[in-house]
From Swiss-Prot:
Biological process (GO), any one: translation
Database matches in InterPro entries: Ribosomal_bS18, Ribosomal_bS18_CS, Ribosomal_bS18_sf
Keyword RNA-binding: yes
PROSITE patterns assigned: RIBOSOMAL_S18
UniProt xrefs under Pfam families: Ribosomal_S18
Gene designation: rpsR
Name this polypeptide is given: Small ribosomal subunit protein bS18
Similarity comment: Belongs to the bacterial ribosomal protein bS18 family.
Keyword Transmembrane helix among UniProt keywords: no
GO cellular component: cytosolic small ribosomal subunit
Species the sequence originates in: Yersinia pestis
């Protein structure tokens, strides 16, 4: 039986020494939402709880200000 390699999860924000996540940094926020627009849970991304809360708040702010879409484009 083949065993697959599971990559170790780590918090990117802790590794980079980020103090506060910025809601205007769309490139970073897009990495943490799915194609359908949902926020990816920390058990998948490996983000620490402190940064996951900040991330959720920033994504919601960016959505409210129309920087990020609430959902994908339905066609």
């Amino acid at each position: 039986m083949a065993r697959y390699f599971r990559r170790r999860k780590f918090c990117r924000f802790t590794a980079e020494g980020v103090v506060e996540i910025d809601y205007k940094d769309i490139a970073t926020l897009k990495n943490y939402i799915t194609e359908s627009g949902k926020i990816v849970p920390s058990r998948i991304t490996g983000t620490r709880a402190k940064y996951q809360r900040q991330l959720a708040r920033c994504i919601k702010r960016a959505r409210y200000l129309s920087l990020l879409p609430y959902t994908d484009r339905h066609q």
